[in-house]
Amino acid sequence: MKVGWKTVMKQQKLVKKMTIEEKAAILSGKTVWQTREIDRLSMRSIFLSDGPHGIRKQAGSGDHLGLNASLNATCFPTAATIANSWNQDLGEEIGQALGEEAASMDVNILLGPGLNIKRSPLCGRNFEYFSEDPYLSGKMAASYIRGIQSKGV
């Protein structure tokens, strides 16, 4: 998703209007997964969700451990499994499905996919990464992101 220069300038002007307290408030969050709104500037709250393999959203606000029940969502294969196909169209289809689910749950930002090369077998997040091959990782991540963004997320 490309952001034009006018949008950047508008955002910079908005940040300049914010007090230090308002800036701190949006960084600290309203809930574990939600930013605070700033009514004075008509800034709405933004909902973020973890989930490169499926949307993770709780019915209520989660506690600091995230122990509330999650809403039902599709669980897709790991990025490594998808990358084994070398099929960018498949990556984009999965991204579209994730984007549709995110939009249906009022999720504004999906925190994924993870893009990193697998440098060590000891990395506990390797399942989130597509491949140790930077070319394949980049192509698959781009297709995934195109799919997600095509649904407005």
Which residues does each PLM region occupy?
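N-terminal beta-rich core of secreted/periplasmic extracellular enzymes
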Residues: 2-153
